[in-house]
Amino acid sequence: MCFGDSLTAGFQAPTADNPRGVMTPYGSFLQELIGSVVRVSVSGVCGELTGEMVTRFRPVVLAQQPTHVVILGGTNDLGWNRAPADIMRNLLEMYELALAEGITPVPVTVPSVRVGDDLRSEEGRRWFAEHLDRRRQLNGLILGYAQSKRLAAFDLFAATLEPDSQQLADRYSNDGLHLTTSGYRLIADRLYQEVFARDELSEPRGE
C-alpha cells in the first residue's frame, strides 16, 4: 500500500499539457513494474497532515493487512511550520503500528521545495534556508529510524534534489511543491529497484 498526502495521490499542478491536473500516483507506476504478483493500492489525501494520517492508519492500512506500506508524509506539516520532532512522532507511530501487525513500513523522506526567482531577495533566501533546514532535520530523523530498524527507506529528497541550488529540481516539479509525471515515475522506479525487486512478493496479500 502507498499511504500519504498529495504526493501519494499523485497531484499535479495544472499546465498547458495537463490542464485538468490529472492525478498520476506513483503507486500506479509501481503496479506496472511489479506486475500481477501483488496488488498495489493507493491511499493519498491532498492537504493531509501526519496527525490525520495517523487517524486513518488503522481503518485504511491495518484493516487491509498489506505486506508493505510506503509512508510519505510531512510536507504539509512543514508548510504549517510544525516542528520536525513533532512530525516524526506521528510518522513513528505509523511505523510502529505497521511493525506490530507484521507489516513492513517503507519510510520515504520529504522532497525539497522550489522557489525560483524568490532566491534573489534576502527575504526569499532566508525563507528557503529555514524550510530547507527543517526538511533536513525531519529527513535525518526518518533515515535514522529506518537504519536503526534495518528497514529499506527511499530518500526522495536526495533523488529529486538540484545539487547546486538545493531546490527541488524543475524537471520533477512544475509548481515547486508537487511532482510531475517524471517525478512520480521516479518514485516508483526507485522503490521497485531499492525495495520491492529485492523482496519475495509472492504472498496473496496486497502491497
Residue ranges and their predicted role:
Residues 1-46, 56-65:
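Serine-esterase "nucleophile elbow" of acetyl-processing enzymes
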Residues 29-36, 52-207:
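Alpha-helical cap/lid subdomain in secreted, periplasmic
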